[in-house]
From Swiss-Prot:
This is Queuine tRNA-ribosyltransferase. Residues 245-251, 269-273 are annotated as: RNA binding. SUPFAM superfamilies: tRNA-guanine transglycosylase (SSF51713). It comes from Photobacterium profundum (strain SS9). Its EC number is 2.4.2.29. It catalyses: 7-aminomethyl-7-carbaguanine + guanosine(34) in tRNA = 7-aminomethyl-7-carbaguanosine(34) in tRNA + guanine.
Length: 375
């Protein structure tokens, strides 16, 4: 992987990631394909929304279908027929999400397989092996996602263990002679001093990119913004920065304002299935009865297949009838909205009008622009 940084405006960055499987223009949003599919979409449909890179889930793909089935096909690209780049998370967040059914030790994590109840163990080395078999273009280190809330001492112990796991991940990745990219994950909860230690430790180990983890786990937005404002300036300029599991359109804009290059989130796909559709002025709840007779498209500014062909009334009808097509059309629209948003952000940075873009973005939502410290 090669990262090129073309232009900056304030802390916002315009660049690109180059892989053997294709180029990713940044800032970029990655749709989530947890089980080797973006729910309800073919790879061709996902590509048509403008997506350049997908996220796959190491934990879930390890449990089902497993490494052997994956290797029979070649790797995850061959299995799901997505031939662009793929980033895989390490499984750390999913293990964190298991709650009381898991036991974390220095060696790794013992837990019950949520599929069949079997006892299972995952550690840094196993995560690297699974991601190697998946053929991930970007591999994530194995870490512990620090929960919120956490005391300073709890966050410190969690972050320090993640650093030790980061070194183990790096060692095993190098031992495999994996030709792809390996990203470190910064932890430390909402504590700036712990984030500093994490950044120092990870940059000393050395990675191809750096993710900010442990955010969007329940903390107030102000804390997320504060941690990003504090952390991003410390990261190497020549390496990509990835904000994990974020988020709403506003979160993407705020992340870019603070120096983030990459995002992923289930929000556009999950919200689509629940009838929450993102448009230029905010959100349309298609289940609202006022849309029953509305013959206009979701968003007159949108060029997606859904908006070019169907009315709000039709989407309302499909939702009321629980038709699968409704979820698919909604998903196409939401994914395209996110990609259009990222393309607009990239153009604005290129043309030195990102500040104006931000003002217009919030004006369309009748909201004030959130403050940006140390801009």
């Amino acid at each position: 992987m090669k990262f090129e940084l073309d232009k900056t405006q304030g802390r916002a960055r315009r660049g690109r990631l180059q892989f053997e499987r294709g180029t990713v223009e940044t800032p970029a949003f990655m749709p989530v394909g947890t089980y080797g599919t973006v729910k309800g979409m073919t790879p061709e449909e996902v590509k048509e929304t403008g997506a350049q890179i997908l996220l796959g889930n190491t934990f879930h793909l390890w449990l089902r279908p497993g490494q052997e089935v994956m290797k029979l096909h070649g790797d995850l690209h061959d299995f799901m027929q997505w031939h662009g780049p793929i980033l895989t998370d390490s499984g750390g967040f999913q293990v964190f999400s298991l709650g009381a059914t898991r036991k974390i030790t220095e060696e790794g994590v013992h837990f019950r397989n949520p599929v069949n109840g079997d006892k299972v163990f995952m550690d840094a080395e196993k995560s690297m092996e699974i991601q190697y078999d998946l053929g991930s273009d970007i591999v994530m280190i194995f870490d512990e996602c620090t929960p919120y809330p956490a005391t300073h001492d709890e966050a410190k112990k969690s972050m320090e263990m993640s650093l030790r796991w980061a070194q183990r991940s790096r060692n095993h990745f190098d031992k495999q002679e994996n030709p792809n990219a390996l990203f470190g994950i910064i932890q430390g909860g909402v504590y700036e001093d712990l984030r500093d230690v994490s950044v120092d430790g990870l940059t000393n180990i050395g990675f191809d990119g750096y993710a900010v983890g442990g955010l969007a786990v329940g903390e107030p937005k102000e804390d997320m913004h504060r941690i990003l404002e504090h952390t991003c300036p410390q990261l190497p300029e020549d390496k990509p920065r990835y904000l994990m599991g974020v988020g709403k359109p506003e979160d993407l804009v705020e992340g870019v304002r603070r120096g983030i290059d990459m995002f992923d989130c289930v929000m556009p796909t999950r919200n689509a299935r629940n009838g929450h559709l993102f448009v230029t002025g905010g959100v349309i709840k298609i289940r609202n009865a006022k849309h029953k007779t509305d013959t206009t498209p979701l968003d007159p500014h949108c060029d997606c297949y859904t908006c070019l062909n169907y009315s709000k009334a039709y989407l309302y009808h499909l939702d009321k009838c629980n038709e699968i097509l409704g979820s698919r059309l909604n998903t196409i629209h939401n994914l395209r909205y996110y990609q259009r948003l990222m393309a607009s952000i990239r153009s604005a940075i290129e043309e030195d009008r990102f500040d104006v873009f931000v003002e217009e973005f919030y004006a369309r939502r009748d909201r004030e622009v959130p403050p940006l410290k140390n801009a």
